Amino acid sequence: MDAASRCDLKVFERLIRKWSPRINLVAPSTYDQTWERHILDSAQLYDFLPSTADKVIDLGSGGGLPVVVLGVLAKHRGCRIKFTAIESDARKCAFLRTAARELQINLSVITSRIEAANVEPGNVITARALAPVSKLLEFAEPLRVAGGTCLFLKGENVQNEVSEAKNSWQFEAKYYPSVTSEKSAILEIGEFYRA
């Protein structure tokens, strides 16, 4: 990670610590691990963005993990990716807008439930700590362009979630080990269809 990205992400870390006690951006038990557990965990997703990525939609963005982190990395690498955060909690949306403004990243924030969001589809859909895979695919279906990619940061139950999702969806999944937790994985799903 370059020095400019690290500097911006340290600013983001301070914003999370400042706002989180009031609006629960991250669990209080993880405040001391914000950099490793949340920011670096989100940053690893950047390397999985396809070279064709130009519009990334983040589902249930909450505290901006991973969308703000990805926006910072894209800015400092000269990538013209448009990021959209969908979040139903207006307080968290205020935080996301503050972070986007202070960090000067290309991020639009939509205050809406995911199912009701009126946004132009994207070619990458991301999510972290939001819902089981079957629900994530349900959310992603109307928001993803044909040929788009889903990148989900998942925990230790990812294999079971994928097996359960295959009861309702047809898809192939690729798993990549997390660099921040041996119990976690990055799940990549390309085309998917209702079974």
Swiss-Prot record:
One of its GO terms (cellular component) is cytosol. Signal peptide: none annotated. It is found in: Cytoplasm. The keyword Transferase applies. Specifically methylates the N7 position of guanine in position 527 of 16S rRNA. Belongs to the methyltransferase superfamily. RNA methyltransferase RsmG family. This is Ribosomal RNA small subunit methyltransferase G. It comes from Dinoroseobacter shibae (strain DSM 16493 / NCIMB 14021 / DFL 12).
